[in-house]
Every structure is written in C-alpha cells, then in structure tokens.
C-alpha cells in the first residue's frame, strides 16, 4: 500500500505515527495537519477493526503500533466494543483554519460517537 512520505524518512514517519496513534486512542481526538490526519485515519481504522476480534494475535498486531499497554487495554476494552456493530468509518476528519506561520492545512481527527 503506498504511503504519504510527508517529507520524512521511513523511521521518522513510523515513529511519528506510532506516537500519533497512541495519543489518538488515549484522548479520542487530536489536532494535526490534513495530510497527517488522512494517513492516521487509515491506520486507526485498521487498528480498531483488528481490535474488534479481541484475541491474542490481534493484541500483538496492535502492540506493533501502539506501544503503551494502557492504551491498548483501552482500545480493546472500551473503543472496539463501542463499534462492534459498525462495519467501518470509526473516525471523522474536520478541517480547520490554516496555520498562521506557514498556512498549512490543519484538521481535527476524532472518533465518531455511536
């Protein structure tokens, strides 16, 4: 699957998205740039779909991306069961005003409430 490069090396991009995923599941929403939000949406949707099966293999797959065990517990015990009947579309991206310094498009990505 092609990824957005976002002007970063592979290791930097991977670390950035790991941190963003962890914060996203911890807080339920984060504010970032639009391209990062679009890429994060793809990863978050896959993590929630994986967490819905709730077995050891799924937990290990999610632990590859989300390094905080408390956040993984929250994902499996609170977030995934909330979307058990929903086939997809767990997140929403809301566009915001451009950033003042460099006019980068900003966005809020958040979990959809059932």
Curated annotation (Swiss-Prot):
The keyword Ribosomal protein applies. The lineage of its organism: Bacteria, Bacillati, Bacillota, Clostridia, Halanaerobiales. GO terms for molecular function: structural constituent of ribosome. NCBIfam families: L17. It holds the Pfam family Ribosomal_L17. This is Large ribosomal subunit protein bL17. Keywords: Ribonucleoprotein, Ribosomal protein. One of its GO terms (biological process) is translation. Belongs to the bacterial ribosomal protein bL17 family.
